[in-house]
Amino acid sequence: MSKPPLYHPVSIGNINLKGNLFLAPVAGYSDSAFRSVCIENGACFTYTEMVSAEALVRKNLKTEILMRRACNESAYAVQIFGGEPEVMAEAARIVLEKTHCECIDINCGCPVPKIVKTGAGSALTRDPDRLFKVVEAVVGAVRRVVPEPVEGPSPGPTPVTVKIRSGWEQKQITWREAAQAALDAGASAITIHPRTKAQGYEGHSDWSIMRQLVEMVNGRVPVFGSGDLFKPEDAKKMLEETGVDAVMFARGAMGNPFIFKDTTSLLTTGTYEPVPAQVRIQTGFAELERLAAETSEQHACLEMRKRFHAYSKGIPNGGPLRKAIVQAATIEDYHKIFDGLLF
């Protein structure tokens, strides 16, 4: 039996996606403006940055802004985090009411101390029993909120997916128990970032764990891989070596939404072409203008300083540009900085 092509469609519950290159939920980056330019460059599925279940239940407006659908987003996932099953269930209902998103993802991997100490994030990977209760509660909540079909039969309940880590520390590797708990509770897909909570984002992710998870799940639900994907060749290698159904770009996509287009080209044709500097900067401006429309010019210009720093990488004599970027406060400032590169 021949192997399927590396680039292929993926289904998450009732969601049918054209390909298997995803944008991960990344705090401080995965807003609707950035997701939209990733989609334009070939991202097949996108996730919001993580949203606090507690804040949703308290009706925090800032939190609701994080969940907005991008202008070109036909399907997306809202990622929520929390450690209390009842609160997570209520948050899931609010998410569906406010966004009508196609998928809800549960964060069981964030290593940030202020998240972990509440029993959320990677604390759930360490505690499979609580993880089961959280996922079960969210799955039960969304099954009671079946979306209305645009036409034809009902699409069924919104799928719930789970993102885990390999464990708490090297002496406490619990991914297998966490994944089994997620499956038993009704998760429709599992993403794994095979680093421990103690590692944070240091060292290397252990891709051999992905292969073991794929074998353990045995096709019951799709498995997605995340960790150390910084160039198209990394994605190709992960798909070949681990057998995951999809790869999820995080830091590798920051300031580089072109990684989706480049990876698609590599997987389907065996090669890809470098993105011209002009296109990189034009894409940065598209993101800037969308972010300003979603929030404010002031917020967008401050936020885009770090992003334009990434967009300008590889531009000859880019040092002076990046020094000027950290002072940019208006859209006009950015135009002056990049005058000559846009047209």
Report each predicted region and the residues it spans.
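Alpha/beta enzyme core
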Residues: 93-120, 127-146, 155-223
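Active-site mouth loops of central-metabolism enzymes
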Residues: 19-29, 76-88, 124-125, 162-175
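Alpha/beta catalytic cores of nucleotide-metabolism and tRNA/nucleoside-modifying enzymes
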Residues: 1-17, 21, 27, 32-33, ...
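Hydrophobic faces of well-ordered beta-strands that scaffold small-molecule active sites
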Residues: 21-24, 46-48, 76-80, 104, ...
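Active-site beta-loop-alpha junctions enriched in small/polar residues
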Residues: 26, 51-53, 81-83, 109-111, ...
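Glycine-rich, positively charged N-terminal anion/phosphate-binding segment
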Residues: 2-11, 26-102
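N-terminal small/glycine-rich loop or linker at the start of catalytic domains
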Residues: 10-21, 57-75, 110-118, 157-166
